[in-house]
Amino acid sequence: MSEPTPIRLTVNGQAREGRCEPRKLLVDFLREDLGLTGTHVGCEHGVCGACTVLVDGEAARSCLMLAVQANGAEVLTVEGLMVDGALHPLQQAFHEHHALQCGFCTPGMLLTALDLLRTNPRPTEEEIRHGLSAVLCRCTGYQGIVAAVAAAASTLDRPR
């Protein structure tokens, strides 16, 4: 068994530190060590996208990334989307467009959509579908999800 390795990172805007075994996955560190259970464990092979988080602003599969690889990084999980108790525009759009059923894929879908809108603030429906194809949903048929992302894009694109 390896010695625990110190790790420091910023999670949802807060500096966090801990010690973990070098082989511990980021998803397990977030869930077990930090108590952030919104990041879901699905396939554990990087296929389903349920474990998607943002690492330094880019979508990453936390089931494929070692926690120590996130040392010094900024990580955003679904718990970090709300600000002062207010839903993020993507979360609000998911609610308004009935873009979830069981909710298992929702955290990964939200963070993947956030990454998509960061790189493409005005995506077409085809671009949204392509951008979200990395996250599997077995309940919704995707139509509500696509509509929600399009609605959020128009909300986020407005001048403030």
Question: What residue spans do the PLM features occupy?
Answer:
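Signature of N-terminal electron-transfer/Fe-S-associated modules in redox systems
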Residues: M1-R160
